[in-house]
Amino acid sequence: MTDLALIDAGGANLGSVRYALERLGVEARVVRDAQGLQGAERVILPGVGAAPEAMARLRAQGLIEPLQQLQVPLIGICLGMQLLFEHSEEGDVDCLGMLPGIVRHMTPALGIRVPHMGWNQLVPMRDSALLAGLPERASAYFVHGYAAPVTADTVAACDHGGLFTAVVQSGLRCGAQFHPERSADTGARILRNFLEMSFP
């Protein structure tokens, strides 16, 4: 069985992500410091809340550099995905810098509410094993007011007043802006794909 580390960065979705993994028959150990990452074969960084507080917590736990230097597959979920980018407009905070791009506040418009809450369709942008087995018009559940831009690393986008990154992968670094633990079959498939796929 894969040694799976689930980082406690203070997000309220930690328990629900853990339960989603248990439904897949996978047990994760909760990690709160750099020592806990030792021996991990896969790492999940969940997160709910604000980027400045999450980065401060990771810094207090001594996890910034260990995450940046990680040599095993990592997936960030929701705020956890945003933290993988260079910077966030939320609190004007520098993030982990593991993916290029700046996370920006979503702009409300006629018929476009911010925060973006609810089910929305994924728009595939390129091939990735992260999307294996998903139906053509798969939908996922989103709750966020900030979003990462579409880049060359974007695997799937989503449209809410403009396209943003919904799923990202660059080498060992992956992310999902939506909540897999609240996205029914789509979320379960993404988590299973991350745990089982081969990485370069």
From Swiss-Prot:
<feature type="active site">
    <location>
        <position position="179"/>
    </location>
</feature>
<comment type="function">
    <text>IGPS catalyzes the conversion of PRFAR and glutamine to IGP, AICAR and glutamate. The HisH subunit catalyzes the hydrolysis of glutamine to glutamate and ammonia as part of the synthesis of IGP and AICAR. The resulting ammonia molecule is channeled to the active site of HisF.</text>
</comment>
<feature type="active site">
    <location>
        <position position="181"/>
    </location>
</feature>
<dbReference type="GO" id="GO:0004359">
    <property type="term" value="F:glutaminase activity"/>
</dbReference>
<dbReference type="GO" id="GO:0000107">
    <property type="term" value="F:imidazoleglycerol-phosphate synthase activity"/>
</dbReference>
<dbReference type="GO" id="GO:0000105">
    <property type="term" value="P:L-histidine biosynthetic process"/>
</dbReference>
<keyword id="KW-0456">Lyase</keyword>
<dbReference type="InterPro" id="IPR017926">
    <property type="entry name" value="GATASE"/>
</dbReference>
<dbReference type="GO" id="GO:0016829">
    <property type="term" value="F:lyase activity"/>
</dbReference>
<dbReference type="InterPro" id="IPR010139">
    <property type="entry name" value="Imidazole-glycPsynth_HisH"/>
</dbReference>
<comment type="subunit">
    <text>Heterodimer of HisH and HisF.</text>
</comment>
<keyword id="KW-0378">Hydrolase</keyword>
<feature type="active site" description="Nucleophile">
    <location>
        <position position="78"/>
    </location>
</feature>
<dbReference type="InterPro" id="IPR029062">
    <property type="entry name" value="Class_I_gatase-like"/>
</dbReference>
<keyword id="KW-0028">Amino-acid biosynthesis</keyword>
<comment type="pathway">
    <text>Amino-acid biosynthesis; L-histidine biosynthesis; L-histidine from 5-phospho-alpha-D-ribose 1-diphosphate: step 5/9.</text>
</comment>
<keyword id="KW-0315">Glutamine amidotransferase</keyword>
<dbReference type="Pfam" id="PF00117">
    <property type="entry name" value="GATase"/>
</dbReference>
<protein>
    <recommendedName>
        <fullName>Imidazole glycerol phosphate synthase subunit HisH</fullName>
        <ecNumber>4.3.2.10</ecNumber>
        <ecNumber>3.5.1.2</ecNumber>
    </recommendedName>
</protein>
<dbReference type="GO" id="GO:0005737">
    <property type="term" value="C:cytoplasm"/>
</dbReference>
<keyword id="KW-0368">Histidine biosynthesis</keyword>
<feature type="domain" description="Glutamine amidotransferase type-1">
    <location>
        <begin position="3"/>
        <end position="200"/>
    </location>
</feature>
<keyword id="KW-0963">Cytoplasm</keyword>
